[in-house]
Amino acid sequence: MFDLSDQLIAMGLWSISIGAFGAAVAGILLANTDLFLTQTEEATLDYLEETELKAIGDEPKSFKAKDLWEKNGAVVMAVRRPGCFLCREEASDLSSLKSQLDQLGVPLYAVVKENIGNEVEQFQPYFNGKIFLDEKGKFYGPQKRKMMFLGLVRLGVWQNFRRAWKGGFEGNLEGEGLILGGMFVIGSGKQGILLEHREKEFGDKANLTAVLDAARKINKQRAQNDN
């Protein structure tokens, strides 16, 4: 026969196990809401246009970011990490719009926050546009948002992993990849930011239809200014 104390201990351990399991499930469920995500602070045109960018190549030169969109507007991708296979997938998706953007006269650019080894060179085949260095990471701000261990328990992240993997995209672990990226459609002159997409989790891509719709507004605005 079991001693009463043994039964009480067994019941206590069972209760603790059930409680721990319930807490774990509750934690995972909460992690898949937006409750613990860093709040996004929207960028302003004044904030972005004075950003110092550098060309990447044999003769790197510095210039103000507003030079990218002042005349014709621009679509600008803020790449989280060039070696990330999710970022390569998003770059490929955006590049699929290149011919339509060309018809609108709207250029496609990307910025990276670091230039390590040949990472940008290896990223270039996925992105049909020029890539520049934003050393201060202003396109990732004003409030830089990070995703760390939370990303490992979010269902959306694993779905994004699966989607990119099935698409045949590969990558590496080189460079900083915790600061989340984004995408901007910026109008010509002082027209402003027409679309701002902030990556809320790894692999959270901008809606391509929304990108084109915003780019079409640039084209119309420029045509009105020319008349």
UniProtKB/Swiss-Prot annotation:
Active-site residues per Swiss-Prot or TrEMBL entry: C84 (redox-active), C87 (redox-active)
Localization per Swiss-Prot or TrEMBL: Cytoplasm
One GO cellular component term: cytoplasm
Function (record text): Involved in redox regulation of the cell. Acts as an antioxidant.
Main location: cytoplasm
Coiled-coil annotated spans: none
SUPFAM superfamilies: Thioredoxin-like
InterPro entries per the UniProt record, alphabetical: PXL2A/B/C, Thioredoxin-like_sf
Keywords for this protein: Antioxidant, Cytoplasm, Redox-active center
Keyword Isomerase: no
PANTHER family, alphabetized: PEROXIREDOXIN-LIKE 2A (PTHR28630:SF31), PTHR28630
GO molecular function: antioxidant activity
Region annotation Thioredoxin fold: where it falls in the sequence: 13-111
Natural source organism: Xenopus tropicalis (Western clawed frog)
Gene coding for it: prxl2a
Protein's recorded name: Peroxiredoxin-like 2A
